[in-house]
């Protein structure tokens, strides 16, 4: 905390807003990492440089959010600028977790641009009045703000990343056919429907199934989307409880709530096709990509309308 206060004091002495400065620095780091991430795809190698840059940007965004929390006196997710910075933090954090367990260069190339676009939009597109810290209206002065909004934003980050991984699966599976028939949780892992489960005398008799990169990406996408879907479900429930406490209504069907519910239905359909129908590869990937656009409409598109309880009211 002393280090954060020292950085804050240094920036103020030099006439710089610490929140905006740290956001811009995070943008620069992610921008520098972008060409390296694409270069690594051609070289078929995973770059530690990209991981270091993304991790540094993630730390800067975390410090930035702490600064804004100190400035405003409330959890920093009350306007579009703060939520975009929080979203970028979530995107970079999940990317780092994924790369740690699955160091595949195509992941860096697929996920880095969405973080760059998010922080660039926040830093250079939004007007100054939406970047400024502001006090909360009485209805938002609740512990539900932290629980509901942070969970929803983390769900957006996970669903966006999972959907982008599905896009990679769709592109890569056009050159190879996924053979595994399972629900991506290790159940029913047979390549042919005619194969039966037989009792073996020893583990040595079992023939391991090797997974291609597209199969591993498909499984990774499924797990990431599942995590995001659970967060979205919890976020919608907590939002309904909060709305009932604040406005006396569980659900008002304003644009944000409507599109959030549509997003939930799309990803519920995605999980249903995988768990119940056994779909793998291209078909569920298409559903996830549809969900990607729905999430973007839910998060950014609603602000074009400028109406509803959840709109930041910038565009119109």
Curated annotation (Swiss-Prot):
Q: Which InterPro entries match?
A: Cyt_c_assembly (IPR002541), Cyt_c_biogenesis_CcmC (IPR003557), Cyt_c_biogenesis_CcsA (IPR017562), Cyt_c_biogenesis_CcsA/CcmC (IPR045062)
Query: Keyword annotations for this protein?
Result: Cytochrome c-type biogenesis, Membrane, Thylakoid, Transmembrane, Transmembrane helix
Q: Which Pfam families match?
A: Cytochrom_C_asm
Its signal peptide is: none
GO cellular-component terms in the record? Answer: plasma membrane-derived thylakoid membrane
One of the entry's Gene Ontology molecular-function terms is: heme transmembrane transporter activity
Is Membrane included in the keywords of this UniProt record?
A: yes
Q: Where in the cell is it found?
A: Cellular thylakoid membrane
Q: How does it sit in the membrane?
A: Multi-pass membrane protein
Transmembrane intervals: 19-39, 47-67, 77-97, 106-126, 151-171, 224-244, 258-275, 285-305
Does the record's keyword annotation contain NAD? no
Q: Which domain of life is it from?
A: Bacteria
According to its UniProt entry, one GO biological process term is: cytochrome complex assembly
> What subunit structure does UniProt give?
May interact with ccs1.
The UniProt similarity line reads: Belongs to the CcmF/CycK/Ccl1/NrfE/CcsA family.
Function summary: Required during biogenesis of c-type cytochromes (cytochrome c6 and cytochrome f) at the step of heme attachment.
**The protein's name in its UniProt record:** Cytochrome c biogenesis protein CcsA
Q: Which organism is it from?
A: Prochlorococcus marinus (strain SARG / CCMP1375 / SS120)
Gene name of the encoded protein = ccsA
């Amino acid at each position: 905390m002393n280090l954060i206060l020292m950085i804050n004091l240094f920036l103020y002495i030099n006439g710089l807003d610490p929140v905006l400065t740290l956001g811009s620095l995070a943008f620069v780091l992610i921008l520098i990492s972008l060409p390296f991430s694409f270069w690594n795809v051609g070289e078929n190698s995973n770059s530690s440089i990209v991981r270091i840059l993304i991790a540094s940007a993630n730390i800067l965004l975390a410090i930035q959010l702490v600064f804004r929390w100190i400035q405003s006196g409330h959890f920093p997710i009350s306007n579009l600028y703060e939520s975009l910075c929080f979203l970028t933090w979530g995107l970079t954090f999940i990317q780092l977790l994924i790369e740690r367990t699955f160091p595949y260069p195509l992941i860096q190339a697929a996920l880095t641009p969405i973080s760059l676009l998010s922080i660039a939009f926040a830093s250079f597109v939004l007007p100054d009045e939406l970047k400024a810290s502001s006090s909360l209206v009485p209805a938002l002065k609740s512990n539900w703000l932290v629980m509901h909004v942070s969970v929803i934003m983390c769900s957006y980050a996970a669903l966006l990343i999972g959907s982008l991984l599905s896009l990679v699966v769709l592109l890569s599976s056009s050159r190879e056919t996924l053979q595994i028939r399972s629900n991506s949780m290790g159940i029913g892992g047979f390549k042919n429907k005619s194969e039966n489960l037989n009792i073996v005398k020893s583990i040595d008799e079992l023939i391991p199934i090797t997974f291609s990169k597209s199969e591993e990406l498909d499984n990774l996408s499924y797990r990431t989307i599942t995590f995001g879907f659970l967060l979205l479900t919890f976020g919608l429930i907590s939002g309904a409880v909060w709305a009932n406490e604040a406005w006396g209504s569980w659900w008002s069907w304003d644009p944000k709530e409507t599109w959030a519910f549509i997003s939930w239905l799309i990803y519920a359909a995605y999980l249903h096709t995988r768990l119940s129908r056994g779909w793998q590869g291209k078909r569920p990937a298409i559903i996830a990509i549809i969900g990607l656009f729905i999430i973007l409409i839910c998060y950014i598109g609603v602000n074009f309308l400028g109406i509803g309880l959840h709109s930041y009211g910038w565009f119109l």
